[in-house]
């Protein structure tokens, strides 16, 4: 699996550290999570297709720690779920020469995410034209 794909999945729910504890669900070739921020102001779900993992549900308690552990690995990463008596206890990520073992959380310590009963009205409208897109693109930092 590409580490970049996993990092992209994580960044979409982690929101720069706003959401740390989530339940990941691996099923039918996809990885999904629903999330809620600690202050309950942000609620959402993220899904990644073409995920090569076994079917399981497991708790990721400290997403920042997980991303830091993944940062030491190369781009092509093998992913395994280690379990004891059928219960997932850790995630093992391995590239050619390095492996990391992330300990999973019990699902009872992961916040329950309620169903969204009604989508709120959106009150922000942003009009984009070629000038605003060009300006925004020019203000982005360049990679060195």
Go through the PLM ranges and name each one:
Residues 34-58, 98-104:
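Extended intrinsically disordered, low-complexity coil regions enriched in Ser, Thr, Gly, Ala
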Residues 137-144:
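Single conserved hydrophobic/aromatic residue that forms the stacking wall/gate
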Residues 59-117:
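Hydrophobic, ordered structural segments
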Residues 120-127:
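Surface-exposed, interaction-prone regions used to assemble/regulate multi-protein complexes
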Residues 1-28:
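An N-terminus-focused feature that recognizes amino-terminal "leader" regions
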Residues 9, 31-33, 66, 133:
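Short, structured motif recognition centered on aromatic/hydrophobic residues
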Residues 24-26, 81-84, 128:
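Generic beta-strand structural signal
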Residues 29-33, 86-89:
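Short glycine/threonine-rich beta-strand-turn micro-motifs
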């Amino acid at each position: 699996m590409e580490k970049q794909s996993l990092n992209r999945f994580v960044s979409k729910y982690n929101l720069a550290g706003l959401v740390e504890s989530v339940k990941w669900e691996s099923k039918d070739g996809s990885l999904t999570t629903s999330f809620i921020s600690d202050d309950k102001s942000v609620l959402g779900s993220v899904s990644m297709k073409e995920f090569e993992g076994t079917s399981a549900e497991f708790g990721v308690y400290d997403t920042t720690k997980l991303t830091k552990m993944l940062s030491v690995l190369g781009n092509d990463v093998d992913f395994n779920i280690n379990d004891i008596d059928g219960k997932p206890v850790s995630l093992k990520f391995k590239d050619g020469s390095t492996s990391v073992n992330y300990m999973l959380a019990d699902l009872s310590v992961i916040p329950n995410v309620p169903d969204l009963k009604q989508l709120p009205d959106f009150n922000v409208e942003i009009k984009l034209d070629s000038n605003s897109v060009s300006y925004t693109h020019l203000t982005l930092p360049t990679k060195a």
